[in-house]
From Swiss-Prot:
Name of the featured protein: EKC/KEOPS complex subunit bud32
Gene: bud32
A GO term from the CC aspect: nucleus
Keywords: Activator, ATP-binding, Chromosome, Cytoplasm, Hydrolase, Kinase, Nucleotide-binding, Nucleus, Phosphoprotein, Serine/threonine-protein kinase, Telomere, Transcription, Transcription regulation, Transferase, tRNA processing
Any one GO molecular function term: protein serine/threonine kinase activity
Job of this protein: Component of the EKC/KEOPS complex that is required for the formation of a threonylcarbamoyl group on adenosine at position 37 (t(6)A37) in tRNAs that read codons beginning with adenine. The complex is probably involved in the transfer of the threonylcarbamoyl moiety of threonylcarbamoyl-AMP (TC-AMP) to the N6 group of A37. BUD32 has ATPase activity in the context of the EKC/KEOPS complex and likely plays a supporting role to the catalytic subunit KAE1. The EKC/KEOPS complex also promotes both telomere uncapping and telomere elongation.
PROSITE patterns cross-referenced by the UniProt entry: PROTEIN_KINASE_DOM (PS50011), PROTEIN_KINASE_TYR (PS00109)
Subcellular location: Cytoplasm; Nucleus; Chromosome, Telomere
Catalytic function, reaction form: L-seryl-[protein] + ATP = O-phospho-L-seryl-[protein] + ADP + H(+); L-threonyl-[protein] + ATP = O-phospho-L-threonyl-[protein] + ADP + H(+)
Annotated residues for binding of ATP: 26-34, 49
Oligomer status and interactors: Component of the EKC/KEOPS complex composed of at least Bud32, cgi121, gon7, kae1 and pcc1; the whole complex dimerizes.
């Protein structure tokens, strides 16, 4: 059997085809590619999100949808920065609506680069450390570790509360879309396996590709439900502490009570769907 051919991303938008150093591809999704690049000077890192054109769509519809989605994401980010929510700042954006060549016609959004680890990685490291040390560490040390993770979850809840207070719905709230930015914005922490990961720092929300502006409690509740399900499927040791997320949510958002009441309804519908299959 022949090996699969290496993935070749679509061409970069024209402003970045001759950038030195070239943008570094970090992740690729169905709708967008994320690169690490620089902004104005080599010493200023930036995140570049590229939405390539879709060759299977009619060109006019493709340009309209791509432009609409990149603008919606940028508007949500600008609004959140203005409201003091921890999200990447928008540095620049553009779309190539007049370029109908194959591989172009897409759009791009350049944002502030956020140092740190995604919360998913932090919690996975913490859970591995807890599993290794469950029998060898004392009760006080394990309790202290639990307190650290509880505090992190409360900060996550406060970040989501600030998001919803500003009238923005994330649309894809998972621990992969949260970054723990360490104090002083230092680089990534190495995983030595010898100690539990640091949980100090600010929680920054990222990836607003599915975000929208809404004041509906139903939308807020669905956001929270998606995050709750993400904990259940990805972080089994941390899931029992999820109530701390909701406690932090209550602390930062005065309208939390009605949103959390609606969350109960959303949970009920989710359980019914699971039973029906």
């Amino acid at each position: 059997m022949s090996s699969a051919e290496p993935y070749t991303p679509p061409p970069l938008p024209s402003p970045f085809t001759n950038t030195t150093p070239p943008p570094q591809l970090l992740t690729q999704g169905a709708e967008a590619h994320l690169y690490k690049t620089v902004f104005l000077s080599p010493s200023t890192p930036a995140a570049l999100k590229v939405r390539p054109s879709k060759p299977y769509r009619h060109p006019i519809l493709d340009r309209r949808l791509t432009r609409q989605r990149i603008l919606q994401e940028a508007r949500c980010l600008v609004k959140l920065v203005r409201e003091g929510v921890n999200v990447p700042a928008v540095l620049a954006l553009d779309w190539e609506g007049q370029n109908t060549e194959k591989g172009f016609g897409g759009a791009w959004l350049m944002m502030e680069w956020v140092e740190g680890l995604v919360v998913r990685v932090v919690l996975e490291r913490w859970e591995r450390w807890m599993k290794r040390n469950q029998g060898s560490s004392g009760a006080e040390e394990l309790k202290e570790e639990e307190n650290w993770v509880r505090d992190l979850l409360r900060r996550i809840g406060r970040a989501v509360g600030a998001l919803h207070k500003a009238g923005v719905i994330h649309g894809d709230l998972t621990t992969s879309n949260l970054i723990l930015r360490p104090p002083g914005h230092v680089g990534e922490q190495a995983d030595t396996g010898e100690s539990s990961p640091s949980m100090e720092g600010d929680v920054v929300l990222i990836d607003f590709g599915l975000a929208s502006q809404s004041l509906q409690d139903e939308d807020r509740a669905v956001d929270l439900y998606v995050l709750e399900r993400a904990f259940g499927s990805t972080h089994p040791r941390t899931e029992p502490f999820f109530e701390e997320v909701l406690n932090g949510y209550r602390e930062s958002y005065k309208g939390a009570s009605s949103a959390l009441k609606r969350l109960e309804d959303v949970r009920m519908r989710g359980r019914k769907r699971s039973m029906i299959g």
